[in-house]
C-alpha cells in the first residue's frame, strides 16, 4: 500500500510543475547580447544587453496590435505598439510603433528601432501576449 501512496504523491508533485502557459517551457533564454548595427530578436519578458555598454533593453510586450491580418487584403497595413524598459543610462520606458511614428527612440546615445514584430496576425485569432517576438536594431 505504501508504494501506491508514494507514487500518488509523485504524480501530484510533477503535475504542479507543468508550465501555466500552453506552448511555453516556463523559461526564457537569459539576457541576450546585442551588437550595435545588427538586428536581433527579443521575446516578451526577455532582456538584451548592448555589447560594450551598460544599456539593457527589456521587451515588456505589445500594448496595441491593429496590423492587417496576413489572410486579408487591407487598405492600410495597420500598426502595433511595443513597450520596452530601458536601463543602464537611467531608467526609461519606450513605446515604439511598427508603422506610425515613433518607429525608434533615442536612449543613452543610441537609436533603438523596431524593425519587425512576429507573429503576423491572422483573421479570427488573437495572438497570445507571450508569443510576440520583436526584431530590434540599435545604432
Role assignments for model-derived ranges:
Residues 38, 44-46, 53-55, 78-82, ...:
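Envelope-exposed proteins and targeting segments
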Residues 117-130, 135-138:
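Short, exposed beta-strand-loop hairpins at the edges of beta-sheets
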